[in-house]
Curated annotation (Swiss-Prot):
Interacts (via SAC domain) with BSP1; the interaction is direct. Interacts with CHC1. Residues 926-1107 are annotated as: Disordered. Present with 1520 molecules/cell in log phase SD medium. The gene is INP53. GO terms for biological process: endocytosis; phosphatidylinositol dephosphorylation; protein transport. Residues 927-942 have a biased composition (Low complexity). Its EC number is 3.1.3.-, 3.1.3.36. The SAC domain is capable of hydrolyzing phosphatidylinositol 3-phosphate (PtdIns(3)P), phosphatidylinositol 4-phosphate (PtdIns(4)P), and phosphatidylinositol 3,5-bisphosphate (PtdIns(3,5)P2). The modification Phosphoserine is found at residues 497, 986, 1035. This is Polyphosphatidylinositol phosphatase INP53.
């Protein structure tokens, strides 16, 4: 494809394929306008009259979507790729190494090359001042991310699916069947996909087959060619990381409220030969509980942030998703029994065994394998002790296999191994590699391709298998941490050398640096790509239908939205380091059972003593004391409260409780901290914050301890501003980005009066004395002037100053310092949906402060997403019926193309070249028993894919079959060659002039003699299993192609691609452009006074008027 631009009569971009052109133009020019883009699909020849000219010399290999950055609309396109894998004939995987973004509504970036730093490349004559004034390309960071070698796409098949799911030979590119979880450009493509969904089948096919919609995954793909005895096989790994909880190592941990876990990766190992096709799938993912880990340099502390009861429903949801998709899940937990990991491991097991939805030892199995302990004596080879522990599950879940000659499925995999360590990286890589090899060996023995006593670790296919897994481990680690995997030396060579150990040490140091200094920027780039930044909106495609539906939906919002009220109790208490057990009922239930809030958020300050030693060595066990004390008090009545979140920073602590029956409405619970003590280096001052969403309404709570001192008003203002800027949640959400905000804590604001004047007013208690003192309150003055806490309100304050008391008494400070009584402890709020009910202090005397509480009623909005979607679909149908031929709509534009009478040459099927149709010398086993990790050994250099016809038809999903054992042997070849070892003579090289007949003959020589299948052993089935993805048989075997044609096609493809194509692609060819390793190299390189309680009712709490 090629991209063109025209300014006549208005700016438009056209992406042109063989037959059609996709024309895009911006709609609306005001900066306040929402990002809109119009789209047309025209015949290629219709572009001539619009004065289009080529925008770039680079070929466009696929469109990845639309994005708006700083008011500019860009279309993203793949402009550099290399072929890296071919799991089956006609299925090619491409690695993306170059992406460009072309602006739709501004020509400033047309025809400009960008340097490696994102700035325009200027002629040498340009002045330095002019160069310094130039801006960086708005999409440079996205471009750099997408071009880092971890993103892949395919023009031939659905790369988001597994081979078993899509079916052998089913090369569908329809977005109807894509798994959105692995589609990393889903935000960029979502409006284009929605638009496509409104088209009929023929029009969908054009968009699919012309490559206008490209699905991009992130992960790994690579193919090696090897031999199993003398049978040539292609070994492939395709790995896909989910974007649902994507992020860098310490920014993405555990599970979220939607049951998505960090670093969730689906990995499929595929073997293809002329006889059989085999596939085995595994998954990995962070432990599905709510936990976090700090970024301290040494042994960062693991913190579980949500109670067991509140976590269990989300845990069950995550595991059940896997069970429904894959079948029984066997969990392999590699965490150690060290103090840093044991708590997390115990919680994992408790959730598995105490679940009421999961059938333990039926739907879910658990094997605990302390990796560090098991490998401490005999090295990493001790991981092999894992196989006997999981062997029963390995045999019962089986694998996917397909008979290439008879074109039918033999078996399916009905179960999955879910492996994890702490990061799901280094230990997990090694364990998954061992499991994969055990499953592959089982397949080879079942099908009598090897015998049980002929398997040796030095076999070439074993070395290639291990190298694939090592390369895969490095790539996944690069994505998550920025370095290669640890232990990869053992993965490749089966042993750990001194160089490997030194390499691991270097990687560990690199990870510490990256985690602390680089991950924040990387996380923001990921969030930009995924559309997670505040107020970031997808570019919408202008369409009269869409405008009609959007307007109608807005006017009919009452049909899918509802409102409700909830009660909240907010409390703040400076406990002055006290750990004395006390009844908190007068604070948490000030009118007893008559007010039991739905949500309770408490902020505590000075939970540890503020001494230099305690600040540097914070005792985080104090949080457990207050969690239990508050929890016991809240649960003294029939209503049960669950602890959903705890956030602690040194002496600051915030607790979030919710009624058990309301917990299902709470999502996206997060925490954040900001230090302001000692210029931001210490946590004695600062803030801890939590945020969550209740229904469709967002809440944020900030518990702060600001600078002390009667005259330090400016320092407190500075602390406030620092906290507002510094508190950042995931997806770069900040405090102002919420519907309801509560700020509470020991704010340390004082009364601007002499001490004796304040004490006299408090002693005399004349009418209106509270209001009189408030006229001199620093916080009240600051809010009224707008100098601090702009937009915040405080309920009517009618209680006496809360500081400073002699502990255990009602007497204000009688010490030598005699501090002026002040309202240091406050609760203020911001939000139109909030109604204050009560604001007072509580008579709890364990500290020199009094606790304060505020009760609120909040209006909550709920959105019924299913009803909204149903209404949206109905409105679309109504519009189409009323405007069947409205001009200007994409549908009528496409229908006018008269597709039935047009040539469909672009959809004709071409002959497919199989990777195994190439001369056998290509991947001949070498004398060395260890395969090189050089990319030259990868089959990517030899892949010659030809575009095939793609189907846009939806596949009807088939319900998950019951568990079955692995299959019986399919073919028994009486002429099977003798076992091959590394000492055997390699197959005779073919000359470079090998003809088609000689290549075909060579493959046919490996064909086993036809004979009856032997009777399967007990427990095995002779039934042929139907693939879940289709009821059709696979397409016939692709015909063989002439070797020189394939080579010449590859040469042309390489010339069309960018010159920056990886060296591996070029290094594998001789001076004549022929693939050397394929043709003649015998040894190829490898790869607030209160009313009496008994007279007080809830009705007596009338809404308070803010000051």
């Amino acid at each position: 494809m090629i991209i063109f631009v025209s300014e006549e009569p208005e700016r438009r971009l056209a992406i042109v394929s063989n037959l059609y052109a996709l024309v895009l133009k911006p709609v609306g020019k005001k900066p306040s306008d929402k990002p809109l883009c119009a789209i047309e699909l025209l015949q290629k020849n219709d572009l001539k009259k619009y004065g289009f000219k080529r925008l770039t010399s680079h070929e466009i290999f696929g469109v990845i979507g639309l994005i708006e950055v700083n008011g500019l609309l860009f279309v993203g396109a793949i402009t550099g790729k290399s072929k890296v894998a071919q799991p089956c004939p006609g299925e090619t995987v491409n690695k993306i190494f170059a992406v460009d973004f072309f602006c739709l509504n501004d020509n400033s970036w047309d025809f400009i090359e960008i340097d490696s730093s994102g700035y325009p490349v200027l002629p040498e004559t340009a002045s330095t001042e002019y160069q310094d004034a130039l801006p960086k390309h708005p999409c440079y960071e996205l471009k750099k991310l997408l071009s880092n070698g971890s993103f892949y796409y395919s023009s031939d098949f659905d790369l988001t699916s597994t081979l078993q799911h899509r079916g052998y030979g089913q090369h569908s590119l329809s977005t109807d069947t894509y798994e959105e979880e692995y589609m990393w450009n889903s935000f960029l493509m979502q409006e284009m996909i929605t638009y496509r969904d409104h088209l009929d089948t023929n029009l969908k096919q054009i968009l699919d087959d012309e490559g206008f919609l490209t699905t991009v995954i992130r992960g790994f793909a690579e193919t090696f060619v090897s031999y199993v005895k003398k049978l040539k096989v292609a070994l492939t790994i395709i790995s896909k990381q989910s974007w649902k909880r994507a992020g860098t190592r310490f920014n993405a941990r555990g599970v979220d409220d939607e049951a998505n876990v960090a670093n969730f990766v689906e990995t499929e190992f595929i073997m293809y030969s002329s006889q059989y096709c085999y596939a085995f799938t595994q998954i990995r993912g962070s432990i599905p509980v709510f936990w976090e880990q700090g970024t301290s340099l040494i042994n960062p502390r693991v913190q579980i942030t949500r109670s067991f009861e509140a976590t269990q429903p989300v845990f069950d949801k995550h595991i059940m998703k896997s069970v429904e998709k894959y079948g029984p899940v066997h969990v392999v937990n590699l965490l150690s029994t060290k103090s840093s990991e044991i708590e997390l491991s115990k919680r994992y097991k408790e959730h598995l065994t105490h679940s009421k939805k999961l059938n333990f030892n039926k739907d879910i199995f658990l094997t605990e394998f302390d990796f560090h302990k098991e490998t401490s004596q005999e090295g990493f080879s001790g991981v092999r002790k894992l196989i006997p522990l999981i062997l029963d599950s390995l045999l019962s879940s089986g694998y996917y296999s397909y008979d290439v000659r008879e074109k039918k499925n033999i078996s399916e995999q009905h179960g999955i191994f879910r492996t994890n360590c702490l990061d799901c990286l280094d230990r997990t890589n090694l364990a998954q590699q061992i499991i994969s090899l055990a499953a592959f060996r089982t397949f080879l023995e079942d099908f009598r391709l090897i015998s049980s006593n002929s398997f040796i670790d030095d076999d070439d296919f074993v070395s290639k298998h291990n190298t694939l897994w090592a390369d895969h481990g490095d790539q996944i680690s690069q994505i998550y941490t920025g370095t290669n995997a640890l232990k990869s030396s053992f993965s490749r060579k089966g042993k750990m050398s001194l160089a490997g150990a030194l390499s691991d040490a270097t990687k560990s140091v690199s990870r510490i640096y990256i985690n602390n200094f680089m991950d924040k920027e990387k996380q923001q780039n990921i969030d930009t790509l995924l559309g997670r930044l505040p107020y970031q909106k997808a570019v919408q495609l202008y369409d009269p239908v869409n405008e009609y539906v959007s307007t109608k939906l807005q006017s009919m919002s009452d049909k899918f939205t509802s409102t409700s009220n909830i009660n909240l109790l907010i409390g703040s208490f400076n406990v002055n380091g006290a750990t004395k057990k006390v009844d908190l009922s007068k604070w948490l239930f000030p009118i007893g059972e008559k007010f039991k809030p739905d949500i309770v958020v408490l902020g505590l300050q000075e939970v540890i003593e503020l001494s230099a030693g305690s600040i540097l060595n914070a005792d985080y066990s104090k949080s457990s004391f207050w969690e239990n004390l508050v929890g016991d008090c809240l649960n003294q009545y029939d209503d049960k409260y669950l602890l959903l979140r705890v956030e602690q920073m040194t002496s600051l602590l915030i607790l979030f409780f919710v009624k058990a029956d309301k917990a299902k409405y709470v999502k996206q619970v997060e925490g954040a901290t900001k230090k302001t003590g000692f210029r931001g280096m210490a946590g004695n001052k600062g803030a801890v914050s939590i945020r969550f969403e209740y229904g469709a309404t967002s809440f944020c709570f900030v518990n702060s301890h600001l600078a002390a001192g009667a005259t330090n008003v400016e320092e407190r203002r500075s602390d406030y501003e620092s906290i507002v800027r510094g508190i950042t949640f995931t997806r770069t959400k900040m405090i102002p980005h919420h519907d309801s905000i509560f700020w509470l804590g020991d704010m340390n604001y004082r009364i601007n009066l002499p001490n004796e004047d304040v004490r006299r007013e408090l002693l005399n208690q004349e009418e209106g004395y509270i209001d009189k003192l408030l006229h001199f309150d620093q916080l009240t003055l600051g809010i009224n002037s707008g100098s601090v806490f702009e937009g915040f309100k405080e309920p009517t304050l009618k209680f006496r100053p809360t500081y400073k008391y002699d502990p255990g008494t009602g007497t204000y400070d009688s010490s030598e310092k005699e501090r002026t009584p002040s309202w240091t402890d406050r609760i203020i709020y911001k939000g139109e949906n909030l109604l204050p009910l009560s604001y007072s202090d509580a008579p709890i005397m364990i500290s020199d402060h009094r606790p304060v509480y505020a009760a609120y009623r909040a209006k909550i909005t709920f959105v019924d997403d299913k009803e909204r979607l149903s209404l949206k679909k109905r409105l679309f149908t109504e519009y189409k019926q009323e405007h069947p031929e409205e001009p200007g709509s994409l549908i009528s534009d496409l229908l006018s193309l008269d597709l039935d009478n047009k040539s469909t040459d672009g959809f004709k099927s071409s002959s497919e070249s199989s990777l195994l149709d190439i001369d056998p010398i290509m991947a001949q086993p070498t004398a060395s028993s260890v395969a090189s990790s050089s990319p030259v050994s990868s089959a990517s250099a030899s892949l010659q894919p030809v575009r095939t016809q793609n189907s846009s038809q939806s596949r009807t999903p088939i319900k998950k079959p019951v568990l079955r054992p692995p299959p019986p042997p399919a073919h028994k070849s009486v002429s099977a060659p003798a076992p091959s070892t590394s000492k055997e003579k390699s197959p005779t090289p073919q000359t470079s002039t090998a003809s088609l007949s000689s290549v075909t003959k060579n493959i046919q020589e490996n064909k086993p003699l036809a004979q009856n299948r032997r009777i399967p052993p007990p427990g095995f089935s002779q039934n042929i299993l139907t693939p879940k993805s289709t009821s059709n048989l696979a397409s016939p075997m692709s015909s063989k192609v002439d070797l020189y044609n394939s080579a010449s096609e590859s040469t042309r493809s390489a010339q069309d691609a960018r010159q920056q194509t990886p060296t591996a692609f070029a290094a594998s060819r001789d001076v004549n452009g022929q693939p050397e390793a394929l043709l003649g190299d015998e040894n190829p390189i490898e790869p607030e006074e209160k009313a009496k309680l008994n007279h007080m009712t809830l009705d007596s709490w009338q809404p308070l008027t803010p000051k």
